[in-house]
């Protein structure tokens, strides 16, 4: 609740301090904001590549060279891949040690100095830490598999097309893997995507934003034929944060199941998946949640879909069909090997195989940091951090008329409608030139050809001073190449 009140203050209260302060462009001003940052200590818990690191051609460290004083890069790409927590190595080393000295008995043998429970229970530890990040009950969350795999598993359970209801509503510019997953699910049920796939396209191609009213209108237009709506909580290209609560309630009032891809939202904004009554959701953990490339993902199933009571071994009418595997089975009977599937309650009952303990350690290493920082404080800082970057971009150089800007910010300007990411559409032919300048300055961002860059300050490790420098670099390089 705290960050929502904070958001309201930003929207309706006096301007943020840097809006009317000419000093906002100075290093000293940015450093004064950093000095007041309650999350500033967490930056030291991440390994930030140096400019020298980025140019390395070998991985082995030079033991004769002290690179601790090398300037760090400015890493604004946490929306693509988060940085490595320093604790990740400790977690993985402890796992490797357990495997080395215990072998298979490591599944059940506790240790006084363990960071995670024995192998058989690591998924429980992951779910416990993940739940508050996405606003869920612990029983509603499972850390498992990968994002697209989990979307397929969830749609296999929740997409139950009938003769009357068979359509899936999705963004026209959804992340390609989501698009492919929906297409293949429709074909799996012997239907054609051209008939069963409803694409919500931007009304104005120059402004690729989907308004809530537009989404609700599409829901109304397909109310009698849609079985499922699957949207991104935060749109990967524009950075738009959709009104999950309103859209979910409206679609459900029409009898439509609602799922959300939270890849760009988990660890970024303060989600409340349980309170918003979301049917299901899935996300990856390697972006803002820093679990490493291709790291283990997560899924959410609302508690009302997780009941598994049975009588005489038979599942009751409320049991939600799913693709099943032994790790989703009840722990008390899992090793009986009697081929009688008794699922765990909640999201855990959707698990298939035993999880990779190696990957789980990488996830938990980062989640432990989130548990100490809290999503409320992370979101509060993010609102200010992204707002500061936006201010620098739209006002620098001070004497430049707005109509002469060599870029357009296509992310909504309303803080309630975005997370940490700002997407900039550059003028024709500027992309490669701007990227070259930023690379030389050690500024790491993300590109989406032919003309968009995505800049994402992560509250746990980015600073106002970095944004002061990088924001001016971006604006200056754009103008310099444009003029």
From Swiss-Prot:
Task: Show the GO MF annotations.
Answer: kynureninase activity; pyridoxal phosphate binding
A single GO cellular-component term from the record reads: cytoplasm
Which residues are noted in the entry as pyridoxal 5'-phosphate-binding? 147-148, 175-178, 232, 261, 264, 286, 326, 354
Could you tell me which InterPro entries the record lists for this protein? Answer: Aminotrans_V_dom, Kynureninase, PyrdxlP-dep_Trfase, PyrdxlP-dep_Trfase_major, PyrdxlP-dep_Trfase_small
- Write out the GO biological process terms: 'de novo' NAD biosynthetic process from L-tryptophan; anthranilate metabolic process; L-kynurenine catabolic process; L-tryptophan catabolic process to kynurenine; quinolinate biosynthetic process
Q: Which UniProt keywords apply?
A: Cytoplasm, Hydrolase, Pyridine nucleotide biosynthesis, Pyridoxal phosphate
SUPFAM superfamilies tied to this protein: PLP-dependent transferases
The record's subunit annotation is: Homodimer.
Query: What is the protein's given name?
Result: Kynureninase 1
The organism encoding this protein is Aspergillus terreus (strain NIH 2624 / FGSC A1156)
């Amino acid at each position: 609740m705290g960050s929502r009140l904070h958001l309201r203050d930003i929207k309706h209260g006096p301007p943020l301090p840097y809006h009317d302060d000419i000093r906002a462009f100075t290093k000293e001003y940015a450093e004064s904001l950093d000095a007041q940052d309650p999350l500033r200590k967490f930056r030291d818990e991440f390994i930030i590549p140096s400019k020298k690191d980025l140019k390395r051609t070998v991985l082995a460290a030079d033991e004769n060279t002290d690179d601790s004083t090398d300037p760090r890069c400015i890493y604004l790409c946490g929306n693509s891949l988060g940085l490595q927590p320093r604790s990740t190595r400790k977690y993985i080393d402890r796992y490797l040690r357990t495997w080395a000295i215990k072998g298979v008995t490591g599944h059940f043998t506790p240790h006084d100095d363990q960071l995670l429970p024995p192998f058989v229970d690591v998924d429980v530890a992951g779910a416990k830490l993940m739940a508050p990040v996405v606003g869920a009950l612990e029983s509603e969350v499972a850390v498992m598999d990968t994002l697209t795999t989990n979307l397929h598993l969830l749609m296999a359970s929740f997409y139950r097309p009938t003769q009357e209801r068979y359509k899936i509503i999705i963004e026209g510019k959804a992340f390609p893997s989501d698009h492919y997953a929906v297409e293949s699910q429709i074909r799996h049920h012997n239907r054609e995507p051209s008939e069963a796939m409803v694409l919500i396209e931007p009304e104005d191609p120059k402004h690729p934003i989907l308004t809530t009213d537009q989404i609700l209108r599409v829901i109304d237009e397909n109310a009698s034929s849609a079985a499922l709506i699957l949207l991104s909580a935060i749109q990967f290209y524009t950075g738009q944060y959709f009104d999950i609560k309103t859209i979910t309630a409206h679609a459900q009032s029409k009898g439509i199941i609602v799922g959300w891809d939270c890849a760009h939202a988990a660890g970024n904004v303060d989600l409340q998946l349980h309170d918003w009554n979301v049917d299901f959701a899935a996300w990856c953990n390697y972006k803002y949640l820093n679990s490493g490339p291709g790291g283990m993902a997560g899924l959410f199933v609302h508690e009302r879909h997780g009941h598994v009571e049975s009588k005489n071994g038979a599942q009751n009418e409320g049991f939600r069909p799913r693709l099943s595997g032994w790790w989703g089975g009840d722990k008390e009977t899992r090793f009986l090997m009697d081929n009688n599937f008794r699922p765990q309650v909640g999201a855990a009952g959707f698990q298939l195989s035993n999880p990779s303990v190696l990957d789980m350690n990488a996830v938990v290493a980062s989640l432990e940091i989130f548990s100490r920082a809290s999503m409320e404080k992370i979101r509060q800082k993010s609102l200010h951090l992204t707002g500061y970057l936006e201010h620098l971009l739209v006002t620098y150089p001070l004497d430049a008329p707005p109509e002469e800007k060599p870029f357009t910010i296509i992310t909504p300007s309303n803080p309630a409608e975005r997370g940490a990411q700002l997407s900039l559409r550059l003028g024709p032919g500027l992309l490669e030139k701007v990227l070259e300048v930023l690379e030389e300055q050690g500024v790491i961002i993300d590109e989406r050809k032919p003309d968009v860059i995505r800049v994402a300050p992560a509250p746990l490790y980015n600073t106002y001073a970095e944004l002061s420098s990088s924001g001016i670099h971006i604006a200056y390089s754009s103008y310099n190449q444009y003029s």
